Amino acid sequence: MVYSLLRPLLFRLDAERAHGLALSALKHGPGCRASPAGPLATRVAGINFPNPLGMAAGFDKDGEVPDALLGLGFGFAEVGSITPLPQAGNPRPRLFRLVEDGAVINRMGFNNGGGAAAARRLAARLGQPGVVGINIGANKDSADRIADYASMAALMAPLASYLAVNVSSPNTPGLRALQDEGALVALLDGVLAARGSVAGVPPVFLKVAPDLEPGDIDAIARIAIDKKLGGLIVSNTTISRPPLASRHAGEAGGLSGAPLHDLALARLRDFRKATGGAVPLVGVGGIASAGQAWERIRAGASLVQIYSAMVYEGPGLARAITKGLEALMRRDGFASIAEAVGSE
């Protein structure tokens, strides 16, 4: 109710400024405790999630408010993408609301304060309850991007519930080429070696693009199984452009929100088939309701994430979705989220 009154005011502001105000409100707000485990609790990649709904990477790029996000009702929060060195990202404006389409286009370019600052911030919350994943990336001008990912894995592994390797942002030139089979094997070998193999190290998830050919999907699935990845996050934003009504439709960057829904769902089903259920999947892209989250779970997602829908629906969306998921799980006769995964 409160957000419905605030939204017209926020939408008069530049999208990036409004995002900054939202971060500030969470940082200085009263805060709430992380959600306790309940009927939606699920175990994925050795991690106990109080519910399967997460905040996707991109909202909290520097790990400033993970606990505040958990307090909104999310079962987990993914911070980042974080790169070894600070970088400003692409020139502004670089974030656009496509209101008529329920969508967002961004070309942020991995803007963040760098690994050292984020690590200090995240180290200060160690011991707090809640699942916090850390999404890692490479600097735009790096001479050795694989070394960037490896150094970030080593730095963040002690601080993360899981690591998410982002090779699918369309806003860093050449980054998506790391999804090619040979490059991806070398990258993951570097990340896994840097993370270590002793008990208690966080699982590694890989975030992939929706704009993949069938051969790419099969290769990534084989690699994920071979490298024993904790999960595949399906998917990042798309560079494709379905028909859009907004005046910002022609902006360069990654498209997210409602127009991504069908593509992301199709890609999730592709990865479910390609992996045979051997690797947990995280469904993300165009989810804005409990029904859509449930659809993604039934299609094979062990976990789901949202972000763009929060822009339009506000901070109450997480609790609305989890409440709806409980009702849908009961309606369809499932005893747990895990039982429903891939049941379509």
Annotate the PLM regions:
Residues 47-54, 128-136, 196-212, 273-283:
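Short beta-strand/loop segments at the ligand-binding rim of alpha/beta enzyme cores
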Residues 85-94, 115-117, 123-125, 171-202, ...:
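Active-site-adjacent beta->alpha loops and helix N-cap segments on the catalytic face
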Residues 1-34, 92-96, 101-116, 120, ...:
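Alpha/beta catalytic cores of nucleotide-metabolism and tRNA/nucleoside-modifying enzymes
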